[in-house]
């Protein structure tokens, strides 16, 4: 078939062959239709139990080949579910799953709300906020062992944990000295450093720049929520957004 007549830019061909009923050989080739060139092709031997994982890996390869950006098909989700008990009370569960929602697993259950799950770069730790001790508190939990540790339980608000690119620090929002400010917490030592200083504003929703030296955050110090940038070790904050009356929840493109 002439795939160009269908205006197809790419063509993916796959083949699965049974080797002994329990193991399979999987092949795929991705072609640029207009250039008549193979972009990538691979062959794998995999047991039946590994077929689903391999399918996600192949999807990642195809996506990155076509777009230049890493795929997310082999990643995992962290999310909070809210359920009602028979007596009408609520219970909460922090869960993780594959990117398509399959294989869900409960990490933590609580009668109190759970908020703001955040993945560590090593994909084995989650930071999150709980209210299980009658106040907001930030925990870090290892997924492989289930071990968890409270890392921020100060007076007032403890919220919005964000991992540094190297996984050694958390940027958090604390109100232990009055209004909410951005702090950086060094996990190995427990050292806490205040980053923002504005007694009249709410500073929150920190996100690290890839260089690990700068942090973006949301602040209403100008009257309405806008995005600002500041060095991770503190200093003068620079306003980045000016269009619109409400700009919040910054994110960094890959």
What are these regions (language model features)?
Residues 77, 123-127, 167-171, 212-216:
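Hydrophobic beta-strand positions that form the internal "hydrophobic ladder"
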Residues 60, 70-97:
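An edge-strand/N-cap motif at the start of beta-rich repeat modules
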Residues 2-61:
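Amphipathic beta-strand/beta-sheet edge segments enriched in Tyr/Trp
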Residues 98-115, 141-159, 185-204, 230-246:
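Multi-bladed beta-propeller domains
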Residues 71-73, 121-122, 165-166, 210-211, ...:
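Residue-level detector of Asp-centered blade-edge/turn motifs that repeat once per structural unit
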């Amino acid at each position: 078939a002439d795939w160009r007549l269908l205006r197809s830019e790419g063509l993916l061909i796959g083949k699965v062959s049974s080797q002994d009923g329990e193991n399979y050989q999987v092949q795929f080739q991705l072609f640029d239709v207009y250039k008549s060139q193979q972009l990538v092709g691979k062959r794998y031997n995999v047991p039946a139990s590994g077929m689903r994982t391999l399918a996600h890996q192949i999807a990642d390869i195809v996506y990155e080949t076509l777009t230049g950006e890493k795929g997310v098909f082999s990643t995992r989700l962290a999310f909070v579910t809210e359920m009602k008990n028979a007596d009408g009370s609520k219970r909460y569960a922090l869960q993780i799953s594959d990117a398509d929602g399959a294989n869900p697993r409960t990490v933590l259950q609580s009668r109190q709300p759970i908020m703001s799950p955040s993945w560590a770069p090593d994909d084995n730790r989650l930071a999150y906020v709980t209210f299980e001790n009658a106040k907001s508190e930030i925990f870090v939990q290892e997924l492989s062992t289930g071990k968890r540790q409270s890392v921020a339980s100060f007076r007032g608000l403890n919220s919005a944990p964000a991992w540094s690119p190297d996984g050694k620090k958390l940027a958090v929002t604390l109100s232990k000295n009055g209004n909410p400010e951005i702090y950086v917490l060094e996990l190995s030592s427990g050292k806490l450093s205040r980053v923002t200083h504005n007694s009249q504003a709410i500073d929150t929703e920190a996100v690290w720049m890839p260089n690990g030296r700068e942090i973006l955050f949301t602040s209403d110090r100008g009257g309405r929520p806008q995005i600002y940038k500041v060095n991770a070790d503190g200093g003068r904050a620079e306003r980045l957004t000016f269009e619109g009356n409400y700009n919040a929840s910054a994110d960094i493109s890959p």
